[in-house]
A protein has these predicted regions:
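Hydrophobic membrane-insertion alpha-helices, especially the h-region
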Residues: 10-25
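Terminal hydrophobic membrane-targeting helix
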Residues: 22-110, 550
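Amphipathic hydrophobic-ligand
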Residues: 49-50, 76-90, 123-134, 157-165, ...
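Hydrophobic residues on conserved beta-strands that form the core of alpha/beta folds
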Residues: 52-53, 67, 83, 107, ...
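Solvent-exposed loop/turn tips at the surfaces of repeat/solenoid architectures
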Residues: 70, 83-86, 110-115, 132, ...
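Elongated, acidic membrane-bridging lipid-handling scaffolds
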Residues: 90, 99-206, 313-352
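Solvent-exposed beta-strand/coil patches in large extracellular/periplasmic or lumenal scaffold regions
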Residues: 101-104, 112, 145, 236-264, ...
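Flexible, surface-exposed loop regions and adjacent strand-edge segments
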Residues: 126, 224-230, 303-306, 452-458
Length: 578
């Protein structure tokens, strides 16, 4: 639309000079329609094919001319359209500019009524804007304020409107020296943005403040997805998630110097403070993100309710990904809640340079322990690669196991691992995963099943006796458990794990499918003495110092299913009693 107005002003300027000189004398006596050929010819010289199909009328208050039923097409075919009326008025104060060759245009008002514009976009379908109404009053480029208002209908019934008070000053070379946009009000359907913007020092310095009242982000994303089908609005567990978004930001930008941005983003009533410092001279970007509390329950995807939807945090990393120099982002969150889990005192430090991003630290307190992560993402090659080092220390398993139904564990978890992978989508990344780790659980306890009781019952069965009636504990208390871990693709293997229950050793291996969360556990039980423990049962000498394998399988969070190896049971039952 701006291009069209510039061309129209350029093409109609000779006509305006002619009209102004005789307008007072001849406005009532001369029919303005006689100037149609001159108007259309002047427009053609400016690269506009113009056809005025309606009447042309003089305007006295303010002084100007109105063209009705106007059709136009740019010679390069990039824009075409029509308008019910195009009205241009003259400013008497700048009338002398026609003679003095002053750069100030003598036009004071422009009004467009009910216009329709068809824009040709390269490699895409044309875009039509309709119901365009534009009014610009008291136009000048000498630093005096003037106003504009516009409203239009974009494709897919998107209603756009805007108004503001403008101030523009040009230097002697007709380049912008300063500008201001005050009382800005921009509306796109239900989204309303207000604020001001000021530019100075030849537009090298730009300051301002912008804010948006509460709006529905999901609804806005659905509108955008009509134009960009690849962008799909997320579907979350809580239908009200991301429906109450607001922001306010202040910025002080120096295009070739040091800039700052301070903003507050409210996501469904949860405030996130974001501050940025931009050093253009040294090509450095620093961003700090902080929040008191974030609850992520409602932001889980409907297709995967166990994790937060990445759309919530992905935009925060965009500046670092696009920055052309060194970048750093620090994260401070006092408390992060996901279901019954609470992660506190979260700190993160991410550094980027030349498409290599290093996570030097991501830590937080979790179930009386601490989690620490570090890693690197290399995006310099066609196939991105990454590595992650993690450590978990002193996690209270009794509290952590409450996150899962039918899973009751106790003890203190310590864990360390290194994982590497590469790929350009979720599937290729999963298939490339490789890593190893060490697991230590101090004083592990499994609640709801007593393995010693199971062992004693099996021993009684092997000896041909009924199991003794005892007041067994409902839990299994083990000695410290250690294990080695190996990751290949979506399969996590636990090898060389071992622990002890009284006079009985447990060791073996297991595997977990990370996609289905189904596990297989192969455990070997070895009784080293003839009693399971000082308070336990007598073990048949037949199975003392003899390995007894158990096979367990199931899904995480499901019922624990574990039984001795059938072939060994048959062998023991058929063996002669000692």
């Amino acid at each position: 639309m701006n291009t069209l107005l510039k061309l129209l002003l350029k093409g109609l300027l000779p006509l305006i000079a002619f009209v102004v000189l005789g307008l007072f004398i001849a406005s009532l006596a001369i029919d303005a329609n006689r100037f149609k050929p001159e108007i259309e010819s002047a427009a053609a010289s400016a690269g506009i094919e113009l056809a005025v199909e309606g009447d042309i009328a003089w305007q006295l208050l303010p002084l100007g001319i109105a063209l009705n039923q106007v059709n136009f097409t740019l010679n390069n075919k990039s824009m075409a359209g029509n308008a019910d009326q195009l009205a241009i008025s003259v400013n008497f104060k700048t009338l002398a500019s026609l003679i003095s060759q002053s750069p100030q245009l003598p036009i004071s008002h422009i009004k467009v009524k009910n216009s329709r514009v068809l824009l040709a976009i390269p490699n895409s379908l044309p875009v039509q804007l309709s119901q365009i109404n534009l009014a610009v009053d008291n136009i000048n480029t000498q630093g005096q304020p003037f106003t504009y208002s516009i409203d239009l209908l974009a494709p897919y019934s998107v209603r756009i409107s805007s108004s503001a008070a403008l101030n523009i000053a040009l230097n002697d070379q007709q380049q912008p020296e300063s500008f201001s946009v005050n009382n800005l009000d921009l509306s796109i359907n239900d989204l309303s943005i207000k604020g001001y913007v000021e530019g100075s020092e030849g537009l090298n310095k730009i300051q301002g403040q912008l804010s948006a009242d509460s709006f529905d982000l999901i609804k806005q994303l659905k509108v955008v997805s009509r134009f960009i089908p690849e962008l799909e609005a997320p579907r979350m567990v809580d239908p009200k998630a991301l429906t109450d978004i607001a922001f306010e930001g202040f910025f002080d930008l120096v295009l070739d110097g040091f800039s700052t941005i301070q903003s507050t983003l409210s996501i469904d009533g949860q405030a996130i403070e974001i501050s940025s410092e931009i050093d253009q001279e040294n090509l450095k970007l620093y961003t700090a993100i902080s929040a008191n509390q974030l609850k992520l329950d409602g932001y889980a995807s409907q297709s995967n309710s166990g994790s937060a939807n990445p759309v919530l945090f992905a935009p925060l990393a965009i500046p670092m990904a696009l920055w052309h120099g060194q970048s750093q982002m620090e994260l401070n969150i006092a408390e992060l809640n996901i279901g019954a889990a609470s992660l506190t005192n979260i700190y993160g430090n991410l550094i980027g340079n030349q498409n290599i991003f290093r996570l030097s630290s991501l830590s937080g307190d979790f179930f009386d322990g601490q989690i620490n992560l570090s890693g690197e993402l290399n995006m310099q090659s066609r196939t991105p690669s990454f590595s992650v080092d993690s450590s978990v220390s002193n996690i209270d398993l009794n509290r952590a196991s409450q996150l899962f139904d039918d899973l009751n564990l106790g003890g203190e978890l310590n864990f360390s691992s290194n994982i590497k992978g590469s790929g350009y989508d979720g599937y290729s990344v999963m298939q490339s995963l490789a890593g190893s780790g060490q697991l230590v659980i101090n004083s592990p306890r499994y609640q709801g099943i007593n393995l010693e009781q199971t062992l004693c019952n099996a021993a009684a069965l092997f000896s041909g006796k009924m199991p003794a009636v005892k007041d067994w504990s409902e839990d299994t208390q083990l000695d410290d458990l250690t294990a080695s871990l190996s990751l290949r693709g979506n399969s996590l293997s636990v090898t060389e794990y071992s622990t002890q229950l009284g006079n009985v050793d447990f060791y073996g291996s297991s595997s977990l499918n990370l996609s289905s969360l189904r596990y297989k556990l192969n455990a070997t039980v070895l009784a080293t003495q003839e009693r399971s423990s000082s308070m336990g049962c007598t073990i048949n000498p037949m199975i003392v110092e003899r390995e007894i394998p158990f096979k367990c399988k199931g899904a995480v969070g499901g019922t624990f299913n574990c039984k001795p190896d059938n072939s060994l049971i048959k062998t023991l039952l058929l063996s002669p009693k000692l």
